[in-house]
């Protein structure tokens, strides 16, 4: 099974991914976590590009969307191996939905992002952790190119659109404590896996 945690920067994806992994392992599942961008050579280029001030320009967003699509293909075999195995779970901190929400601008249509990610495995379940932009900014350890209120607001709106248009996506309010949010994530996993 391939589970993805999504949401704007500062929402707590990394913390919740770690907590979910521990819980699933205690329940007898074999669990691996991954993060986007990956540690591949392509992922390293992406990380460097994300740090540049011009990273949010439309041209750079187009380039990043292509790089992310290529980076995701480095995970394709690994994801496909666990997708049909109920005892193995792969939890990803981000997926191609991040490209749809982050690289979505006036010059980049979501349809193009879907097209360049055509060969990327789709998650079995995506959980969008949702908080408002002000709370996200308070939680961010450091401010980077993508962590400004206007950009986070637009990105959050794009995530909320996905909840309405895509299958197997649920939204969880990430405002409460980490433990309350984790309980809600577990409830969604229990419901999906019919545990």
UniProtKB/Swiss-Prot annotation:
GO cellular component: cytoplasm
Keyword hit for S-adenosyl-L-methionine: no
Signal peptide positions on this chain: none
A biological process term (GO) from this entry: dTDP biosynthetic process
E.C. number(s) listed in UniProt: 2.7.4.9
Keyword ATP-binding tagged: yes
Keywords per UniProt: ATP-binding, Kinase, Nucleotide biosynthesis, Nucleotide-binding, Transferase
Ligand binding (ATP): 7-14
GO MF terms held by the record: ATP binding; dTMP kinase activity
Catalytic activity reported: dTMP + ATP = dTDP + ADP
Pfam families named in the record: Thymidylate_kin (PF02223)
PANTHER family: THYMIDYLATE KINASE, UMP-CMP KINASE 2, MITOCHONDRIAL
Family recorded in the similarity comment: Belongs to the thymidylate kinase family.
NCBIfam families reported for this sequence: DTMP_kinase
The protein's name in its UniProt record: Probable thymidylate kinase
High-level lineage: Archaea, Methanobacteriati, Methanobacteriota, Methanomada group, Methanobacteria
Gene: tmk
